[in-house]
Amino acid sequence: MHRRNFLQWGSLGLSAITFSGFRNSGTGNKPLVISTWDAGIAANAAAWKILRSGGRALDAVEKGVMVTENEINCCVGLGANPDRDGFVTLDACIMDENANCGSVAFLERIKHPISVARRVMEKTPHVMLVGSGAQQFAVSEGFPLESGKLSDDAEKAYKNWLKKSEYKPVINVERSKSPMANNVPTRLENGQWNHDTIGMVAIDVQGNLSGSCTTSGMGFKMRGRLGDSPIIGAGLFVDNEIGAATATGQGEDVIRICGSHLVVENMRNGFSPENACKAAVERIVKVKGVEKCKEIQVGFIAINKRGEYGGYCLQKGFNFAVCYADDKNFMVDGKYIL
């Protein structure tokens, strides 16, 4: 049953709005799926199998990110880096074309938090479940409890972090230039970003939009910390009359501006997807300041109702995957402002 309706607003004469195009939004493609980072190539491929057969965007965005969640040594699922106490905790949210949404946070030992989030949406009167309650619900829905053992990569990283760890809040961790800082995403020695989230948005052949976002959160975070990824309006937002957006990067700064909701509202006001994302990134710089933004990364991606897409980020290095045909699944480098 679908009983969650989040911020359903009136149409406000939306049919009169025109969206400006730009080069990497193409001519408008339906169906279309886009997702954050290079892990999005495999995720898009799984989502595309559903979209090309006329399937629903909601099913596509769930199945797509499950591919990434399922990786053993990866940045998103149970194979990701743990918190400071050595436990992997997962967050996810999902939203459909009817403004139904579901979310889980601080979830342990469940392989596919995105699917649990969908069950929250479809089988409870709530939007979000957290912690032991989310785990209890997942088990009651037939999700098996997995081993709490860290992956080989995560265990190695955790032991390395413990050598110099300090168990206290790191207020200005974004200023750290260490490749093994207490947070991710952070800039690595090779200039790339260590990221920990996949967000996906899609439009199906019916013209309906949906989105998903799943993460392990910041590596070595304080126990109980949540970022933007499971928060509807921050890490993900869908308005079927306008468009859909998702975020990646320093979650606290995405939350401060209700980032994905802001991107969609920018599109409501006539911005192209790319320019809508750019305006949201500019808002972060305005709120946080240029100097503090130089050592963090935030990126947004978005699609509109016409099947146009775009993305923008703070720093060079963010990219996203785009798929709209069997032979059209490719990476796009996000434009950046710093």
Pin down the residues of each PLM region.
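Alpha/propeptide regions of enzymes that mature by internal proteolysis
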Residues: H2, Q8-A16, S25-L338
